[in-house]
């Protein structure tokens, strides 16, 4: 679930 977090950054 790191892709979503990386999208926000």
Curated annotation (Swiss-Prot):
It catalyses: 2 a phenolic donor + H2O2 = 2 a phenolic radical donor + 2 H2O. Its cofactor is heme b; Ca(2+). One of its GO terms (cellular component) is extracellular region. Its EC number is 1.11.1.7. GO terms for biological process: hydrogen peroxide catabolic process. Binds 1 heme b (iron(II)-protoporphyrin IX) group per subunit. Coiled coil: none annotated. The keyword Transmembrane helix does not apply. Disulfide bonds: none annotated. Belongs to the peroxidase family. Classical plant (class III) peroxidase subfamily. This is Peroxidase 9. It comes from Cycas revoluta (Sago palm). The lineage of its organism: Eukaryota, Viridiplantae, Streptophyta, Embryophyta, Tracheophyta.
